[in-house]
Amino acid sequence: MPELAELRLTADYINECSQGKGPMIHYIKIEKNPAHKGTHCITPESPKDYFSLSAESRGKELILYIKEGDKTTPLRMSMGMSGHFKLTNTGQESKHAHLKFYRKDGTTLSFVDVRRFGKWKAGETWSTNRGPDPTTEADEFKYNVLKNLDKRVFDQPIHLVLMNQKYFNGIGNYLRAEILYRLPEVNPFMEAREVIDNCPMLLELCTTIPRKAYSLGGGQLKDWENPWQSDKEKFERFIKCYNNKNMGHIMDKNGRRFWFDPKWNIKMLEHISKQK
């Protein structure tokens, strides 16, 4: 699943395709795959004239701005497990293209989503149930966590709370593993409140680790195609813990595999016994 770094790279890709270094690209039509009929995929009406497209990310969300003349319509998107954008010649779009933006120059920018967990909604801005972006709103992010430490959600182990998008918007499976691995003194099965109270570096890493992932070009994650030709080897060297056969791992209560330093195996067993 694409995480904070991959969402920002997706926004960069859309902006590069739509603006680049030359004249503004003109779009002429928006088309939704008729397979999407639910309320989770509300598509704007196709503008009657040429329109431009730009994008911005915040945590795990993306907003496309569809601008026709003086009118701008936001289109909020989540990528799901496999969603990404791809520019092709018109008529050569993937069979898994579920939202298409046709361009005057004979090309199409498509939202491709093999597993179809992605969703979008026209006219919507950022979700109110997601917290600030840890990288672009670092101060707001820290404040949001610290002011809510008395909430019951922080009774849970830190490895679970890091996946809570209300407080850690953009942190996903590989980022939580890398953040916690870089805190060797932190038991990942300890109560989140205690960890945050005693280890302020945790919140710092929630900012610096995603920034580093972004600067390295993001990952080529399972079921997700990176729109950029990033240096795969550099990113793989950056990933120390996630999906590493030498690390410990456990399925968390949300069904996601959590990777951790194996020195915490005993604490992991204690955690499992408490759940029974």
Regions found by a protein language model. Give the residues of each.
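Acidic, proline/glycine-enriched N-terminal capping motif
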Residues: 1-130, 196-197, 258, 267-269, ...
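Short, mixed-charge, low-aromatic patches
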Residues: 99-103, 130-138, 157-164
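Basic, nucleic-acid-binding surfaces and adjacent catalytic neighborhoods in DNA/RNA-processing proteins
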Residues: 16-46, 56, 63, 68-72, ...
